[in-house]
Amino acid sequence: MTAKTYQDITVGEAPDLVSIAITNPPDKTVYKLNEYFDRTGMLVTATFADGKSRIVSGYSVSPNGALGKTDTTITVSYTRKGITKTATQAITVVYLTSIVISNPPTYTEYYEGNSFNKAGMVVTAIYSNDATKILSDTDYTVTPEILMMKMTSVTISYTENGVTATTTQAVKVNY
Protein backbone atom coordinates (compact mmCIF):
# COMPACT_ATOMS: atom_id res chain seq x y z
CA MET A 1 0.00 0.00 0.00
CA THR A 2 1.30 3.43 -0.95
CA ALA A 3 0.29 6.58 0.81
CA LYS A 4 0.58 10.02 -0.72
CA THR A 5 0.84 13.15 1.30
CA TYR A 6 0.18 16.62 -0.02
CA GLN A 7 1.28 19.85 1.53
CA ASP A 8 0.32 23.35 0.49
CA ILE A 9 3.32 25.55 -0.25
CA THR A 10 3.02 29.29 -0.41
CA VAL A 11 5.56 30.90 -2.68
CA GLY A 12 6.17 34.55 -1.94
CA GLU A 13 6.90 37.06 -4.60
CA ALA A 14 10.60 37.56 -5.29
CA PRO A 15 11.92 40.71 -3.60
CA ASP A 16 12.54 43.82 -5.68
CA LEU A 17 15.98 44.71 -6.92
CA VAL A 18 17.41 47.62 -4.90
CA SER A 19 20.94 48.08 -6.28
CA ILE A 20 23.91 46.46 -7.96
CA ALA A 21 27.61 46.89 -7.31
CA ILE A 22 30.78 45.70 -8.97
CA THR A 23 32.25 43.76 -6.05
CA ASN A 24 35.31 42.56 -7.95
CA PRO A 25 36.70 44.61 -10.83
CA PRO A 26 37.55 42.97 -14.14
CA ASP A 27 41.06 41.63 -14.60
CA LYS A 28 41.68 44.16 -17.37
CA THR A 29 40.89 47.88 -17.10
CA VAL A 30 43.38 49.36 -19.59
CA TYR A 31 42.58 48.92 -23.28
CA LYS A 32 43.97 49.87 -26.65
CA LEU A 33 41.74 51.89 -28.93
CA ASN A 34 39.14 49.67 -30.68
CA GLU A 35 39.51 46.75 -28.25
CA TYR A 36 36.38 45.30 -26.64
CA PHE A 37 35.64 45.32 -22.90
CA ASP A 38 36.55 42.01 -21.24
CA ARG A 39 34.34 40.94 -18.30
CA THR A 40 36.79 38.28 -17.11
CA GLY A 41 37.19 38.42 -13.32
CA MET A 42 34.37 40.95 -12.79
CA LEU A 43 31.74 40.08 -10.19
CA VAL A 44 28.44 41.94 -10.03
CA THR A 45 26.42 41.70 -6.81
CA ALA A 46 22.73 42.56 -6.64
CA THR A 47 21.04 43.66 -3.41
CA PHE A 48 17.32 43.02 -2.93
CA ALA A 49 14.55 44.60 -0.85
CA ASP A 50 14.71 41.76 1.68
CA GLY A 51 18.32 42.78 2.45
CA LYS A 52 19.86 39.75 0.78
CA SER A 53 22.59 40.02 -1.83
CA ARG A 54 23.89 37.61 -4.41
CA ILE A 55 26.33 37.52 -7.30
CA VAL A 56 24.45 37.74 -10.58
CA SER A 57 25.15 37.00 -14.21
CA GLY A 58 22.94 38.02 -17.08
CA TYR A 59 23.95 41.65 -16.83
CA SER A 60 24.71 43.81 -19.86
CA VAL A 61 27.58 46.22 -20.43
CA SER A 62 27.74 49.43 -22.39
CA PRO A 63 29.48 50.23 -24.61
CA ASN A 64 29.40 46.68 -25.91
CA GLY A 65 31.39 47.39 -29.08
CA ALA A 66 34.86 48.66 -29.82
CA LEU A 67 36.10 51.11 -27.20
CA GLY A 68 36.76 54.67 -28.35
CA LYS A 69 38.89 57.61 -27.26
CA THR A 70 36.11 59.09 -25.10
CA ASP A 71 35.24 55.87 -23.23
CA THR A 72 36.27 56.23 -19.59
CA THR A 73 33.68 53.99 -17.93
CA ILE A 74 31.73 50.84 -18.62
CA THR A 75 28.11 50.88 -17.46
CA VAL A 76 26.84 47.57 -16.10
CA SER A 77 23.04 47.09 -16.14
CA TYR A 78 21.03 44.34 -14.47
CA THR A 79 17.26 43.94 -14.72
CA ARG A 80 14.93 41.87 -12.57
CA LYS A 81 11.14 42.06 -12.54
CA GLY A 82 11.25 45.14 -14.76
CA ILE A 83 13.57 47.03 -12.39
CA THR A 84 16.95 48.00 -13.85
CA LYS A 85 19.91 49.12 -11.78
CA THR A 86 23.33 50.23 -12.99
CA ALA A 87 26.90 50.47 -11.76
CA THR A 88 30.01 51.80 -13.47
CA GLN A 89 33.55 50.53 -13.87
CA ALA A 90 36.38 52.94 -14.67
CA ILE A 91 38.54 52.02 -17.67
CA THR A 92 41.36 53.64 -19.58
CA VAL A 93 41.56 53.60 -23.37
CA VAL A 94 45.10 54.23 -24.59
CA TYR A 95 45.63 55.61 -28.08
CA LEU A 96 48.28 57.26 -30.21
CA THR A 97 48.39 61.05 -29.79
CA SER A 98 51.55 62.10 -31.61
CA ILE A 99 54.97 61.18 -32.90
CA VAL A 100 58.23 63.04 -32.44
CA ILE A 101 61.66 62.76 -33.96
CA SER A 102 63.72 62.04 -30.87
CA ASN A 103 66.96 61.80 -32.83
CA PRO A 104 67.40 63.49 -36.23
CA PRO A 105 68.57 61.54 -39.27
CA THR A 106 72.25 61.38 -40.10
CA TYR A 107 71.62 63.03 -43.46
CA THR A 108 69.50 66.14 -43.91
CA GLU A 109 71.09 67.50 -47.09
CA TYR A 110 70.30 65.88 -50.43
CA TYR A 111 70.50 66.33 -54.18
CA GLU A 112 67.36 66.58 -56.28
CA GLY A 113 66.09 63.08 -57.14
CA ASN A 114 67.60 61.44 -54.04
CA SER A 115 65.48 59.37 -51.68
CA PHE A 116 65.24 60.32 -48.01
CA ASN A 117 67.60 58.25 -45.86
CA LYS A 118 66.18 57.18 -42.47
CA ALA A 119 69.62 56.24 -41.10
CA GLY A 120 70.16 57.53 -37.58
CA MET A 121 66.62 58.86 -37.22
CA VAL A 122 64.66 57.76 -34.16
CA VAL A 123 60.89 58.29 -34.21
CA THR A 124 58.97 57.95 -30.94
CA ALA A 125 55.22 57.39 -30.62
CA ILE A 126 53.47 59.14 -27.72
CA TYR A 127 50.23 57.81 -26.25
CA SER A 128 47.28 59.28 -24.36
CA ASN A 129 48.63 57.90 -21.06
CA ASP A 130 52.04 59.53 -21.72
CA ALA A 131 53.63 56.17 -22.51
CA THR A 132 56.13 56.16 -25.36
CA LYS A 133 57.37 53.60 -27.87
CA ILE A 134 60.38 53.85 -30.16
CA LEU A 135 59.31 52.90 -33.67
CA SER A 136 61.34 50.75 -36.03
CA ASP A 137 62.07 52.35 -39.37
CA THR A 138 59.55 49.98 -40.99
CA ASP A 139 56.73 51.21 -38.71
CA TYR A 140 56.48 54.69 -40.24
CA THR A 141 56.46 56.18 -43.72
CA VAL A 142 58.27 59.17 -45.17
CA THR A 143 56.73 61.27 -47.94
CA PRO A 144 57.63 62.19 -50.54
CA GLU A 145 59.98 59.32 -51.37
CA ILE A 146 61.87 61.28 -54.03
CA LEU A 147 63.18 64.71 -53.01
CA MET A 148 62.77 67.68 -55.33
CA MET A 149 64.18 71.21 -55.45
CA LYS A 150 62.62 73.77 -53.12
CA MET A 151 61.56 71.07 -50.63
CA THR A 152 62.30 72.08 -47.08
CA SER A 153 60.85 69.09 -45.21
CA VAL A 154 59.51 65.57 -45.45
CA THR A 155 56.47 64.23 -43.60
CA ILE A 156 56.81 61.29 -41.22
CA SER A 157 53.55 59.33 -40.66
CA TYR A 158 52.65 56.48 -38.32
CA THR A 159 49.26 54.76 -38.02
CA GLU A 160 48.11 52.57 -35.13
CA ASN A 161 44.58 51.29 -34.49
CA GLY A 162 43.17 53.67 -37.07
CA VAL A 163 44.87 56.78 -35.63
CA THR A 164 47.52 58.50 -37.75
CA ALA A 165 50.11 60.87 -36.30
CA THR A 166 52.49 62.97 -38.38
CA THR A 167 55.51 65.19 -37.92
CA THR A 168 58.02 66.79 -40.24
CA GLN A 169 61.77 66.61 -40.65
CA ALA A 170 63.67 69.52 -42.18
CA VAL A 171 65.75 68.78 -45.28
CA LYS A 172 67.79 70.80 -47.75
CA VAL A 173 67.68 69.78 -51.41
CA ASN A 174 70.50 70.97 -53.69
CA TYR A 175 70.84 70.89 -57.51
In which residue ranges do the predicted regions lie?
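Serine/threonine-rich, repeat-prone extracellular segments and beta-strand-based repeat modules
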Residues: 1-12, 28-29, 51-85, 91, ...
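Extracellular interdomain linker/stem segments of modular secreted and single-pass surface proteins
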Residues: 12-18, 93-99, 173-175
